[in-house]
Design a protein with these regions (language model features):
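Alpha-helical transmembrane segments and their membrane-interface boundaries
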Residues: 1-150, 158-194
Length: 194
């Protein structure tokens, strides 16, 4: 999220705790009468590094965390964009990763160009709704490519207020190109090691 301090930080922590308590209450209400055949320790006993599911979990965790670490060490803002893009590209089957990566960056560029066109074509009072338009577009898009296009709108609107439109667009495109390439490379290395 965005860096905050003082009272804003305190309010953010309080809101996170309240949100957590609400989620816990809903989860407890919906699950309390459900029969459970497995306990908490069964999760650890069932873990097998050689199962395809656990192997993917490990690959996904390491891909996202190392990519975000690299971006943070380079002091590049919006490391979360890299993490989200890595999560999007790092799918369970390695054969699907490269095709997804090939769609991620180009359609992010398309989304960025459409955002820039909307940003400069629409009056300023409409700008806050560009993100909502993007959210509706994601909801109605059946394919990954167009979901990627529409997904850029909200992120770029918020980032443009912080960095300016040009820098926000360059950060968004750069983050997605890096994440796509990094995920493909990490998948290759990971598969050779494990």
């Amino acid at each position: 999220g965005y860096d905050v301090a003082g009272k804003s930080y305190h309010l953010r922590v309080v809101s996170l705790v309240v949100g957590m308590l609400i989620c816990m209450g809903v989860f407890y209400k919906n699950q309390k009468n459900r029969p459970h055949k497995r306990g908490f320790m069964d999760i650890f006993r069932e873990f097998n590094i050689h199962s395809s599911r656990n192997n993917w979990y490990l690959k996904l965790t390491l891909t996202v965390s190392t990519a975000m670490l690299i971006i943070n060490l380079l002091n590049i803002p919006r490391a979360m964009w890299v993490g989200i893009a890595c999560m999007s590209v790092c799918v369970p089957f390695s054969s699907d990763i490269a095709p997804k990566a090939k769609k991620r960056a180009p359609f992010n560029i398309v989304g960025s160009l459409i955002f820039v066109a909307l940003y400069y074509a629409l009056p300023k009072w409409v700008h806050p709704y560009i993100g909502i338009i993007g959210g509706i577009g994601v909801g109605y898009s059946a394919g990954y490519s167009w979901q990627t296009v529409y997904n850029t709108f909200g992120a770029l609107y918020i980032a443009s207020g912080i960095f300016g439109v040009k820098t926000a667009v360059l950060l968004r495109i750069g983050a997605n190109i890096f994440a796509s390439l990094y995920t493909v490379l990490f998948d290759h290395v990971f598969n050779n090691v494990f």
